[in-house]
């Protein structure tokens, strides 16, 4: 049951997105919908609006490509200059309420695709489209959606659903191996679709038509997430392979998708993938075409993310900065050398915090409690206050004075004028921020919480 439940969710929840188009056709595509059955049961009414929308790498357009008002049993929508891609047909009720998805269709060959005819019905709280005329792939897509909706409603069982989907897949392969619907089937209905190697082999990234679809972007994201337990180096290689193998029109979209996926990665250190991909494929564009595609605001945010993170990634030498303590004495951190006895190693913890931050107020006592009971390799903690009020700093310093642990050396520092440039060098755009280095200043942990810090310290001390 698990496999078919997954497939039903995948197809029923087809996402909508904005559209630009790839190839022009000499003429228009007409979509003729016979809505008699849906009107008779009240699912569609006169005065309702039916619209066609398309995709640009999984994003739905805000404006319809074509729309019409229901006046009788049938409605004809004309898609001028129909292009290759994936489309959805939406219903907006005159009385208001949620916009509903009536059906989907593909245009795989824009030059020969001229007309689609469907009968629209409504049951099981879902619309059903029966293909009457048009491309063979859309007849199969209508069958697929009907089977999935029947399965979701419980009107057919797991065995019947499997037989239906397998039959549709076989007919798709026999009908037109180059159709967009066939690519969708390869990615979702093949018995090998849980194999990472198989999915990579059938991702149609060399096909420029898939830029204007939703299903390929979803497959790329699922593919990358299935590999997230790999090392950062391996993930960077995998990400670059995706971008490099793609058609030139797809490259910036795939690179942006990878950047967005890894910039806030749950697994520590994987933000390095976002930095590397952005530097190579989004910011290294002398023509300015990528900046124009992304828009200035998005382009600037990517550039800022890279600049704020590229100096303090895991495995790097932590940037050297000088900060004063409460007596005005400058401390150069991180210290790069061995322990105080000339042989023993130590760890160095950077903790950037302030007083008017609710997260800091929650984190500081947890960190102090952790360091109080810590036993292991000696730690130097640099408690770096990012505020500008000396009195508030002194008050915050008192919270760390409770740490009475011979394994922990605390140094309170601040930089009210930001002369050290620590926000840029250490990516401190918000507080609290924690970063751990070795006694040589090599970064071994970043974006830490008290819990993840404790887990990292346990792992280091076990080794």
Can you annotate each of these PLM segments?
Residues 270-326, 335-345, 372, 391, ...:
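N-proximal helix/coil linker or "cap" segments that precede and/or mark the start of modular domains
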């Amino acid at each position: 049951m698990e496999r078919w439940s997954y497939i039903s969710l995948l197809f029923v929840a087809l996402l909508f997105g904005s559209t630009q188009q790839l190839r022009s056709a000499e003429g228009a595509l007409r979509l003729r919908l016979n809505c008699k059955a849906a009107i008779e049961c009240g699912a569609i009414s006169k005065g309702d609006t039916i619209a066609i929308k398309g995709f640009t790498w999984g994003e739905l357009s805000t404006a319809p490509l074509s729309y019409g008002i229901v006046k009788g049993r049938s409605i004809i929508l004309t898609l001028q200059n129909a292009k290759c891609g994936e489309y959805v047909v939406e219903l907006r009720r005159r009385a208001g309420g949620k916009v509903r998805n009536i059906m989907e269709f593909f245009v795989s060959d824009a030059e020969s695709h001229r007309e689609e005819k469907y009968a629209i019905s409504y049951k099981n709280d879902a619309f059903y489209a029966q293909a009457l005329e048009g491309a063979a792939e859309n007849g199969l897509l209508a069958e697929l959606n009907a089977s999935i909706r029947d399965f979701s409603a419980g009107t057919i069982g797991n065995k019947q659903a499997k037989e239906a989907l397998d039959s549709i897949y076989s007919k798709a392969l026999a009908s037109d191996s180059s159709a967009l619907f066939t690519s969708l089937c390869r990615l979702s209905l093949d018995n090998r679709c849980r194999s990472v190697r198989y999915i990579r082999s059938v991702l149609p990234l060399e096909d420029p038509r898939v830029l204007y679809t939703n299903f390929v972007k979803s497959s790329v994201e699922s593919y990358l997430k299935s590999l997230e337990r790999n090392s950062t180096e391996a993930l960077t290689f995998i990400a670059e392979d995706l971008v490099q193998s793609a058609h030139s029109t797809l490259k910036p979209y795939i690179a942006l998708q990878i950047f967005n996926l890894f910039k806030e990665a749950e697994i520590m250190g994987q933000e390095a993938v976002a930095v590397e991909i952005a530097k190579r494929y989004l910011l290294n564009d002398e023509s300015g075409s990528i900046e124009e595609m992304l828009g200035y605001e998005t382009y600037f945010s990517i550039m800022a993310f890279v600049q704020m993170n590229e100096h303090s990634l895991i495995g790097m030498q932590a940037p050297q900065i000088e900060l004063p303590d409460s007596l005005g004495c400058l401390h150069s951190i991180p210290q790069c050398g061995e322990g105080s006895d000339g042989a023993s190693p130590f760890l160095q913890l950077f903790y950037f915090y302030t007083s008017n931050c609710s997260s800091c107020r929650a984190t500081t006592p947890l960190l102090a409690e952790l360091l109080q009971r810590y036993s292991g390799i000696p730690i130097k903690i640099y408690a770096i206050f990012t505020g500008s009020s000396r009195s508030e700093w002194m008050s915050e310093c008192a919270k760390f004075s409770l740490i009475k642990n011979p394994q922990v050396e605390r140094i309170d520092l601040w930089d009210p004028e930001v002369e050290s440039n620590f926000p840029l060098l250490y990516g401190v755009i918000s507080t609290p921020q924690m970063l751990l280095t070795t006694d040589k200043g090599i970064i071994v942990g970043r974006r830490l919480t008290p819990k993840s810090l404790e887990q990292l310290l346990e792992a280091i001390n076990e080794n």
